[in-house]
């Protein structure tokens, strides 16, 4: 696996967090959570919904759907240029 593939999840979550993009997170049990991603690490995502924070374990997440499109290609290019 190359480095870009390994960081796709972090890239996606970081863009959502930075842009305060509202998301719906679907859990493996079918439950839906709506809010804004405030932070994440290797194992968890922190979601802010109506002023309340929830820590969700990534192994419980099925799908993350942003309310607006996320341009990962532009973000990936910007990060690559910043490294040069």
Swiss-Prot record:
Gene: hfq
Subunit structure: Homohexamer.
Sm domain mapped to chain residues: 10-70
GO annotation terms (biological process): regulation of DNA-templated transcription; regulation of RNA stability; regulation of translation, ncRNA-mediated
Organism: Moorella thermoacetica (strain ATCC 39073 / JCM 9320)
Alphabetically ordered keywords of this record: RNA-binding, Stress response
Function of the molecule: RNA chaperone that binds small regulatory RNA (sRNAs) and mRNAs to facilitate mRNA translational regulation in response to envelope stress, environmental stress and changes in metabolite concentrations. Also binds with high specificity to tRNAs.
GO MF term set: RNA binding
Family of this protein: Belongs to the Hfq family.
Protein name: RNA-binding protein Hfq
GO cellular component entries: cytosol
InterPro entries the UniProt entry points to: Hfq (IPR005001), LSM_dom_sf (IPR010920), Sm (IPR047575)
